[in-house]
Amino acid sequence: GFVATRNWAEGAYPSECWYNLEGDDVLGILSTRNPEETILWSGDKDLKQIPGLHLDNEGNTYSISDLEADVYFYRQVLTGDTTDGYPGCPGIGPKTAEKLIPEQDFTEASAWGTVIKQYEKKGFGPDYALTQARLARILRNTEYTFDELQLWTPLTIPSTPPTTPSTKE
């Protein structure tokens, strides 16, 4: 089972155990810490927000650029991920998110502005959008130092007051 396999792997290969972090965060941190020495292999689509070299299940490698990773992250903030337990912005699926956050002319400031605007259209404020972004975010090397997490923060935070979801019917 799992425990026997883990014990074998820890004995056969250099290994570490990181407490209080999810496995995908550890992968994101390690991959962005040593991008020349790391290949990510995972069935978790969320890891598309991590730049670097990836391996698919057929054994093919492909590269995800910083731009592609950042675009994927902002789209994920809009679509949410029910498997990971955050809903995203109501009514926005992958195709809509792709139209709202295009790769062409992408900037983080414009992407974040789009995210805020979409959440506000649904009656949510910037604080709620920020919570969704932090739930979507897979940590990168610059966002974690030993036992110290730096919560993701957008480059610009709008100065509008926080709002709560409307109760219109």
Model-identified regions with their sequence ranges:
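Extended two-metal-dependent nuclease catalytic cores across DNA- and RNA-processing enzymes
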Residues: 1-168
